[in-house]
Amino acid sequence: GQIMYNAVKDFKKPVVALVHNAGSAAFLAIAGVKEIVASGELSRLGSIGALVSLDRKFIQTYKDRFDEIYSDLSSDKNAGIRSYIETGDSSLIKQSLNETVLAFQSIVTAHRDVKKKEETLRGGMFQAKDAKSRGLVDIIGTEDLAIKRLKTYFK
């Protein structure tokens, strides 16, 4: 999402995004476009958040099979995952996720006129009409409409 967002941001011409489903990284990728067109009323957008999935069985197998030895000069390396593996404490991982979400929200609100911010930025997905009322979509329509909207920027 971040790489595509940067590419759109640096692109010298307006970009109109036509999407059916755009959640999480896909929404980040289109956050800076000139207009977002939802392809129909069943389109869903949002999921402005972050998560990490950790396989407990894999972690237990990893703990049983491997020893990790860190340099005395690298005591903070992988601190979040190390804390989780060693003690089950996910607080450092959550802290990192929270920082990521705040940055994600900042990007979205810098480019979109987000309504109902507290609700909209909690990670939910919204169908097209609801997403439009929240400022996540500009218009609901077809590919032809998206092309027409794009052409208006080149007159």
Language model segments and positions:
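Glycine-rich beta-to-alpha transition loops that act as phosphate-gripper elements at the mouths
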Residues: 17-23, 120-124
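Short coil/turn linker and secondary-structure boundary residues
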Residues: 85-88, 126, 141
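C-terminal long alpha-helix characteristic of the crotonase
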Residues: 94-118, 128-155
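Short linear loop/turn motifs
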Residues: 73-77, 121-124, 144-148
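Small-residue-centered hinge/linker elements
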Residues: 1-13, 22-111, 152-155
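Glycine-centered flexibility sites
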Residues: 25-26, 46-49, 123, 135, ...
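Short, flexible active-site loop motifs that bind/organize anionic cofactors or intermediates
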Residues: 83, 121, 136
